[in-house]
């Protein structure tokens, strides 16, 4: 092969490589730009990644820091139904979902005298609306008082007799994107807690920093998962990532770079 032919071949290869690289870079840039823009639009309609915080109560006493003694539920039964409903905007799939949460929490007065308990249930932030919201404290189901305050919490007061207990029932349906989580307060003891999650998808993946279920059973369209914390200090959060869908832009960019 002549030197000129070799140089020409190398030049063609170099130009072709550069062209593919530029194409891949352009696809990556356009995809990232489009993803950021569309993600905001989708989150505005479907809501962000949602986190449900564990509820708590307190009563006033001079023997506690700040004059308040915090009390966590003595028993918790939580049921979560997660339905993946991916939505397509442009050429991109977004990991949207619907979630139905129902919970029963038992709060117990640990003292030998009657106490006024202030029971607080935090709501997920920036939701796309809570449908069928329920906050039933014992036998009093006055919906007029079950309205969140400025902090995004529903708080009710109830007088509990010595060693008495009351059950708080909560429930709602809403929508979110990417991830759903249930979070516990740091460095607190979680007792008699059980969360059962059912999904309509088999591709289960737990977010970084969350715990794995103690039980799992696959059914026709997804999984039934159980997290059981009978007595755990600093319990890990519980969570689920939505299944990923292949998007044309990132795939084309990887092919171009390859």
Q: What function would you assign to each model-found segment?
A:
Residues 44, 66-226, 232:
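Soluble non-transmembrane domains of integral membrane proteins
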Residues 26-49:
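Alpha-helical transmembrane signal-anchor/signal-peptide segments
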Residues 228-258:
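Cytosolic-side membrane-insertion boundary helix
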Residues 1-5:
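Positively charged n-region of N-terminal signal peptides that target proteins for export
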Residues 44-64:
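Juxtamembrane non-transmembrane segments of integral membrane proteins
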Residues 16-20, 43, 50:
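Intrinsically disordered, low-complexity leader/linker segments that occur at the extreme N-terminus
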Residues 6-24:
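Hydrophobic membrane-insertion alpha-helices, especially the h-region
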Residues 54-57, 209-210, 241-242:
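Short coil/turn segments at secondary-structure boundaries
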